[in-house]
């Protein structure tokens, strides 16, 4: 295989601190690059649920994290097949790029037919979820019109039966420098450019949960949403969702949940940045079983 020997490739290669393989690749057809970041050991516990979800969908999981020094090998082996520790740069896309380098170097990588990029910004699944990929050449889980139309970068993937890995390499290694601490630059050059770049290359693109569908679901549920108590704040929130470009993982998380993506964003639970009315009450309602409710409360108490 021809590797993209660009300046970005060389910088990222030199920034990799260690690679630990817990399970052999053995010609897996699906690979997930799982980007993580933890501030303390307790925060790492919920990764196991996401890892099991990926494994249950037949993915070989490469976990990439900046150096922290707080995790033991006994923790890591429960959450991935391969662990890559790296210097901290480029935010999530720095981890995605490190994982992609590893994929390029795997013996037998030409037989991979699905490549998934996923980060740890959400918790779950809390329930059954097998809608993780699409038959398109490039897909995202959700899209957004904030700033400009783009696919959100917490979960996206490629069908490598139809897409040459070189196109993905070029996106990561032959464009804007990913070796940076400038968050706005990373967002502009990578997240906001994902759809634009690959659509421009002629790839057939799709979204598993389009924002237009989620908004339509939200409108249909108006009478269930706008009710006492907190009627005024609910009306204001409703108008905001209908009239503005919103983040579907924040304002439309419930519609996502009901559409078969039973995950919740950490930031939403921790900060409720959009002022979702009665958020925690609604989360407990949709959890359903006592097991999920108890686990959610424990995660919230210990990790958020």
UniProtKB/Swiss-Prot annotation:
InterPro entries: RgpF (IPR007739). Keywords: Virulence. Pfam families: RgpF. Could be involved in the biosynthesis of a major surface antigen important for virulence. This is Virulence protein VirA. It comes from Vibrio anguillarum (strain ATCC 68554 / 775) (Listonella anguillarum).
